Amino acid sequence: MNKQSINIAQIRREYTHKRLRRADLTLEPMELFERWFRQASTAQLLDLTVVSVATVDQTGQPYQRLVLLKHFDAKGMVFYTNLGSRKAQHLAHNARISLHFPWHALERQVMVLGTAKQLALKEVMHYFSSRPRNSQISAWASSQSSLIDTRDTLVSTFLKFNNYFHQGKVPLPSFWGGYRVHIDSMEFWQGGAYRLHDRFIYQRIASGWRIDRLAP
């Protein structure tokens, strides 16, 4: 190793931004998520909607990737993808999924566990029609997760579809869609001094939500 390599064991800082107390909690987890989301938006966090999505393949091997959250409400959280992608293939045989929001600037993170269900065509078409035209073209151009020789291959395919759809609206590809994550549990983490972080977990039960504090 280079003598001037970074000593990562000594990289640390104290988390002193805020506390999370039981009195701060809401009855429903999505209400607290919306509050934190608005606070993150007010703080102008970069890439606010970026979320890490974890799935597993048929051998149990986990995979993660970053996607963009496109909607959330009491019914769950929504993201869109190529239905031939690795994540979509995983969800086809195991719909269990985990989402992670890393809002480092606010010393916060949110972890979601749930089940992903494919969106109805009408909802997908409504969102696809709102995308910028180049994003619509890229949905056609990329066979997500497949092997390609060079970036030039991808660009060439993009230009081909850009020319093909040069007039009128870009249609929705049959292989493109979205998922709604129906939430079973949601954990809220607020960094604390001396590593005494605040963690609360909401878990769905028959009568609503059970809320517990977790040790850091």
Swiss-Prot record:
Signal peptide positions are none
Q: Which reaction does it catalyse?
A: pyridoxamine 5'-phosphate + O2 + H2O = pyridoxal 5'-phosphate + H2O2 + NH4(+); pyridoxine 5'-phosphate + O2 = pyridoxal 5'-phosphate + H2O2
Q: Needs which cofactor?
A: FMN
Annotated positions binding substrate: 12-15, 70, 127, 131, 135, 195-197
Q: Which InterPro entries match?
A: Pyridox_Oxase, Pyridox_Oxase_CS, Pyridox_Oxase_N, Pyridoxamine_oxidase_dimer_C, Split_barrel_FMN-bd
Keyword flag Flavoprotein: yes
Pathway given for this chain reads: Cofactor metabolism; pyridoxal 5'-phosphate salvage; pyridoxal 5'-phosphate from pyridoxamine 5'-phosphate: step 1/1; Cofactor metabolism; pyridoxal 5'-phosphate salvage; pyridoxal 5'-phosphate from pyridoxine 5'-phosphate: step 1/1
EC number(s) per entry: 1.4.3.5
- PROSITE patterns in the record, alphabetically? PYRIDOX_OXIDASE
Primary enzyme class: oxidoreductase
Q: Enumerate the residues binding FMN.
A: 65-70, 80-81, 86-87, 109, 144-145, 189, 199
* Top-level taxonomic group: Bacteria
One of the protein's GO biological processes:
pyridoxine biosynthetic process
Pfam families under this entry?
PNP_phzG_C, PNPOx_N
Q: State one molecular function term (GO).
A: pyridoxamine phosphate oxidase activity
The record's cofactor note says: Binds 1 FMN per subunit.
UniProt keyword annotations, A-Z: Flavoprotein, FMN, Oxidoreductase, Pyridoxine biosynthesis
Q: Kindly state the subunit structure of this protein.
A: Homodimer.
Family assignment?
Belongs to the pyridoxamine 5'-phosphate oxidase family.
As for what it does, the entry says: Catalyzes the oxidation of either pyridoxine 5'-phosphate (PNP) or pyridoxamine 5'-phosphate (PMP) into pyridoxal 5'-phosphate (PLP).
Protein name (Swiss-Prot/TrEMBL): Pyridoxine/pyridoxamine 5'-phosphate oxidase
- The species this protein belongs to is Baumannia cicadellinicola subsp. Homalodisca coagulata
Which gene is transcribed and translated to give this protein?
pdxH
